[in-house]
Swiss-Prot record:
WD repeats lie at residues 136-174, 182-222, 232-278, 334-374, 383-423, 429-469, 489-528. Belongs to the WD repeat WDR12/YTM1 family. This is Ribosome biogenesis protein YTM1. It is found in: Nucleus, Nucleolus; Nucleus, Nucleoplasm. PANTHER family: RIBOSOME BIOGENESIS PROTEIN WDR12, WD40 REPEAT PROTEIN 12, 37. It holds the Pfam family NLE. The gene is YTM1. Residues 14-29 have a biased composition (Low complexity). Residues 33-124 are annotated as: Ubiquitin-like (UBL) domain. HAMAP family: WDR12. Residues 1-32, 276-304 are annotated as: Disordered. Residues 1-10 have a biased composition (Basic and acidic residues). It comes from Malassezia globosa (strain ATCC MYA-4612 / CBS 7966) (Dandruff-associated fungus). GO terms for biological process: maturation of 5.8S rRNA from tricistronic rRNA transcript (SSU-rRNA, 5.8S rRNA, LSU-rRNA); maturation of LSU-rRNA from tricistronic rRNA transcript (SSU-rRNA, 5.8S rRNA, LSU-rRNA). The lineage of its organism: Eukaryota, Fungi, Dikarya, Basidiomycota, Ustilaginomycotina.
């Protein structure tokens, strides 16, 4: 509103002062003490004059929200009826924390007087998502992917990938698929290759990364025979991430990044529809011309999938014994100490973010051939990460990364800052190790975290000292299920977490073998 005429500025300020005068029935001697405040916001179209407002020290969030709405209504109406303005609830951030008490209580806690001018930032208030539904599966849920509308993809330690319908989560059985390679192997991660819900990439405890197509709509467990196995990792795969780009009008390519307990990161380029080139092969000797075979001489003909090697391999933690030396010694490569690594893609497929149990956090420039572009060193053990998204028109996201740690903390790492390691440390964010973080798909300020304490929290980086709200996975999803845990059972670990594409719902899964859906409304909306 800085570009509004001065008369509108004066009218808005005058209206705000009028709204704060005591009613005639209250004598000035009994009027509450006042404190000067300044109000600012980053919400587009919601700024009010940045001038001191004298408000009663007894005011709380609701009265402050009324003040902002009154000034906005008067200024935006520019003399017209205020009835057309629709009030919006606001929250207020002071000194990096949401205001959850009266102004005088805040001043008392800080040992400040009412003469101090308080700087408050107002943001749109968000109601917490409410538990909507849940489904149970046979084993722990190791990861969830809710990026596809109305489809929830889960990986499980029983080696099965399941696809749930979010509209009928508890009532409709999931489509269940067992990749052929994972019949006796636990899956650690599963991601959609693209938004059409027909292609999937999985990671496993065996170190295999596999890309395959969903074979149909069966609701029973079926093997997937045409899985392209991407071979590199010599230890369990700890994380995978995917970015899709259109190379021409008819083809899409998917970039996959995988990270493992061996300390390495592999970057792969695959067809986004998971349709790989194949070559027919028989049981005959190689090099012989194939011919039609009959009778007892007939041998089975199969299609061998041509799988690509990694585009590049990065070592977040230098191996104690590398692949070349291991081959010379006729032994297996040996990872370095604390080599367990996680990774994610940023800026589409132009950056790779990674963190390892050795306490290092890095990002790599893929365009420059995988060169190390930034490094942070901490005394923490990272368990999960997700890059913050930028809503600007810039082609690059802000080089910031959210990490969850073994010591129950969260941290924001800003690679624009060459001095400090953690730009924002959030100690005691949970009561147990933080196992999952997920940045909001719409808002540049919000992210969610899940932990071994069974809690899910939503945070605003503008108010890092406390979560916006905390959710708990319900102990029982159905009163008809007698085998469910009792209400006295301690909370179980959250292992997977994701937002739906519109950012209005959270999906979680974990140790309790359940997939839970929490539905909200207008979460992360940055306008009025």
């Amino acid at each position: 509103m800085s570009d509004r005429p001065d008369r509108v500025h004066d009218q808005a300020a005058s209206s705000s002062r009028d709204s704060m005068t005591s009613t005639p029935s209250i004598s000035s001697s009994n009027a509450p003490a006042t404190v000067p405040i300044r109000l600012r916001t980053s919400l587009p179209g919601c700024s009010i004059p940045y001038v001191p407002y004298m408000v009663p020290v007894t005011w709380r969030r609701s009265q402050l929200s009324t003040l902002v709405n009154k000034v906005l209504a008067t200024a935006q109406g520019a003399g017209h009826e205020e009835a057309s303005y629709k009030a919006v609830p606001f929250d207020f951030i002071v000194d990096g924390s949401l205001l959850r008490c009266s102004l005088d209580e805040y001043l008392e806690q800080r040992g400040q007087s009412a003469e101090t001018t308080l700087e408050l930032e107002y943001i749109r208030s968000t109601l917490p998502p409410a538990f909507k539904d849940a489904a149970r599966q046979d084993d722990w849920v190791s990861s969830v992917d809710a990026r596809h509308a109305h489809r929830i993809l889960t990986a499980s330690y029983d080696g099965i990938v399941r696809i749930f319908d979010s509209e009928s989560l508890a009532t409709s059985p999931p489509q269940s698929y067992t990749p052929a390679y994972a019949s006796n192997v636990s899956l650690t991660s599963a991601k959609w290759l693209r938004n059409t819900a027909d292609a999937i990439v999985t990671g496993s405890m065996s170190g295999t990364v596999a890309v395959w197509r969903v074979p149909g709509t069966e609701t029973k467990s079926v093997p997937v025979l045409q899985a392209a196995e991407l071979e590199h990792h010599t230890s369990p795969v700890s994380s995978i991430d995917v970015a899709v780009a259109a190379t021409n009008a008819s083809a899409e390519r998917a970039t996959i990044v995988s990270a493992g307990w061996d300390g390495s990161i592999a970057l792969w380029d695959v067809p986004a529809d998971a349709r790989f080139e194949t070559q027919e092969e028989t049981g005959g000797a190689p090099g012989k011309k194939r011919r039609k075979q009959h009778g007892s001489d007939a041998r089975p003909i199969s299609s061998a999938i041509i799988t690509p090697p990694p585009l590049m391999v990065l070592h977040h933690v230098t191996p104690s014994l590398g692949a070349t030396a291991a081959r010379a010694l006729n032994t297996a490569p040996t990872p370095g100490p604390n080599a367990r690594t996680i990774a994610a893609l940023g800026d589409g497929d132009q950056r790779i973010w990674s963190a390892a149990w050795d306490g290092t956090v890095k990002y790599w420039d893929v365009v420059a051939g995988g060169g190390l572009a930034g490094r942070k060193q901490t005394d923490k053990v990272p368990l999960c990460l997700d890059p913050l998204q930028s809503l600007s028109l810039s082609s690059f996201t802000t080089p910031q990364l959210v990490c969850g740690h073994m010591d129950h903390s969260l941290a924001l790492y800003d690679f624009r800052d060459a001095v400090s390691n953690a730009a924002l440390a959030m100690s005691g964010a949970h009561a147990a190790p933080v196992s999952a973080v997920k940045v909001h798909p719409v808002s540049a300020h919000l992210f969610a975290s899940g932990a071994y304490d069974g809690r899910i929290k939503v945070w605003d980086v503008r108010s890092p000292k406390q979560a916006l709200f905390a959710l708990s996975e319900p102990v029982s999803t159905s009163s008809k299920s007698s085998h469910m845990a009792s209400s006295k059972q301690p909370r179980t670990k959250v292992l997977g977490l994701d937002w739906t594409p519109d950012g209005n719902a959270l999906v979680s899964g974990g140790e309790d073998c359940r997939v839970c859906l929490y539905q909200g409304q207008a979460i992360g909306i940055e306008h009025v």
